[in-house]
């Protein structure tokens, strides 16, 4: 893919994000910032489309979140100038684990724990 093609894709994404926000009355966006590549790209796109002052991010950590992920997420926010906050969702995950253990009579397995974390992050962002 050429630079020109990549720029065209980027500009289309930027225009569509701005248009979607305008059409739905959203002046600001809230996104999850994990310290990974996907959320880094989304945050840069949002800043480019809306301006950093309209981008807000949450790093929703659990007991499994590495210090490196926290550092990278903070660096991404600082470099791009958007609002950023770390919140600990582990207490919510722990409550869900206890609830599920009561329902099913055993502790949740690894894949279930991963899904709980992903769903809690999604619920938090949709709230």
Q: Where on the chain are the PLM-derived regions?
A:
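Short, functional N-terminal and low-complexity linear motifs
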Residues: 12, 40-42, 91-95
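Conserved acidic
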Residues: 2-9, 65, 112-117
């Amino acid at each position: 893919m050429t630079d020109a093609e990549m720029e065209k894709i980027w500009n289309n994404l930027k225009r569509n994000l701005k248009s979607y926000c305008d059409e739905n009355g959203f002046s600001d966006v809230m996104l999850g910032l994990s310290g990974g590549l996907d959320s880094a790209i989304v945050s840069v796109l949002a800043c480019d489309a809306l301006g950093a002052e309209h981008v807000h991010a949450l790093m929703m950590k659990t007991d499994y979140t590495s210090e490196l992920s926290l550092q990278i997420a903070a660096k991404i926010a600082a470099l791009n100038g958007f609002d950023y906050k770390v919140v600990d969702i582990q207490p919510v995950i722990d409550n869900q684990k206890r609830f599920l253990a009561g329902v099913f009579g055993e502790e949740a397995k690894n894949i279930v724990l991963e899904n709980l974390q992903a769903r809690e992050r999604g619920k938090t962002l949709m709230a």
